Amino acid sequence: GSTATLALTVANTGDKALPFSVGFHPYFAASKLDNVAFDIDAATCSESAKGEQPAAPETITLTRKEGSADSIRLMTGVKSPMRFTDSGNGHKVTVSFDESVFTNGVLWQQDAESFICMEPWNGWANSVNEAGHHIELNPGESKEFKWSVTIW
């Protein structure tokens, strides 16, 4: 397969603590949801980041609720790598990451079923406004977020 590695460094050049969270949003071609099988190990898995999080099932799936425009799975305690195989187009996708900086994962798909997002995150959307759900860097500190994707 072919592998691409990406890295983001967040540096606090200011004079007070910098709250932030990071999440990448890669899109991968997919034939349709029914053809995709995920291989993901996570502690929890739900459709919302709010409230108590249910334990992740042994097999994580991404299905569309009737009448919904998208499908989402928010996962905590995600282990590297996350993988999926698409029996419709023959693609195999692996997302590898450093578990010490990426603790969450997201699966997302919207509208036409021509793609799937399989995303390493360390927080949730708007987490800087929720205590305990983001990272803070002190002045002069920096943190690197590195991940890779391999496609066969």
Give the predicted meaning of each segment.
Residues S71-I72, G132-L137:
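Beta-strand-rich interaction surfaces with strong enrichment in secreted/lumenal proteins
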Residues L6, V22, M82, V93, ...:
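Hydrophobic residues positioned within well-ordered beta-strands of beta-sheet architectures
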Residues D86-A125:
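Glycine-rich active-site loops that engage anionic ligands at enzyme catalytic sites
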Residues L8, E136-W152:
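Short Pro-Gly-centered flexible turn/kink motifs
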Residues A17-P19, P26-S100:
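Active-site/ligand-binding surface loops and adjacent short beta/alpha elements
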Residues G1-F20, F24-H25:
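Acidic, contiguous internal or C-terminal segments within carbohydrate-active enzymes
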Residues T13-D15, S31, G123, W152:
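Short coil/turn motifs at secondary-structure junctions
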Residues A4-L6, T76-V78, K143:
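Short, solvent-exposed loop/turn segments enriched in Ser/Thr/Gly
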